[in-house]
Amino acid sequence: MRKYETIFILQPDLAEDDVKSVTDKVQDVVASLKGDFHRLDDWGTRKLAYAIRKFPRGRYYYLRFDGGAQLVAELERRLRLDEKVLRFLSVNITDEPEKKVAERKPVIEAAEAPEAAEAAAE
């Protein structure tokens, strides 16, 4: 299974019941197609770069899950059909850049930092 991130933007003026129904549908799609659900974060309401369907603001959600191509296709199909969703984007993150950063060796070790500062001062 591959790792995916999906960010979707909902209309900012939705009631909590409507928001809950959309997020529940998203989780149901992941579960029904045997995906592994990791997290769903509410990033809050933010100003959009440009108005989408006459909404200058949108409520952002971040979804992270593992699954196959069919899962992503079905999730995007359902988001596309829901009028409460303004935009969405799914990205394959199987090769995470965080791993590459973690493998890097620091230029100066923590113990060497005071010695380097003293040498530079002289």
From Swiss-Prot:
InterPro entries, alphabetized: Ribosomal_bS6, Ribosomal_bS6_sf, Ribosomal_S6_plastid/chlpt, Transl_elong_EF1B/ribsomal_bS6
GO cellular component, one term: cytosolic small ribosomal subunit
Signal peptide, first to last residue: none
Protein's GO biological process: translation
Keyword Iron part of the UniProt annotation: no
Gene Ontology MF, one: small ribosomal subunit rRNA binding
Keywords: Ribonucleoprotein, Ribosomal protein, RNA-binding, rRNA-binding
Top-rank taxon, per record: Bacteria
Annotated NCBIfam families: S6
Family of the protein in this entry: Belongs to the bacterial ribosomal protein bS6 family.
Functional description taken from the UniProt entry: Binds together with bS18 to 16S ribosomal RNA.
PANTHER family with a match to the protein in the record: MITOCHONDRIAL 28S RIBOSOMAL PROTEIN S6, SMALL RIBOSOMAL SUBUNIT PROTEIN BS6M
Protein's name in the database: Small ribosomal subunit protein bS6
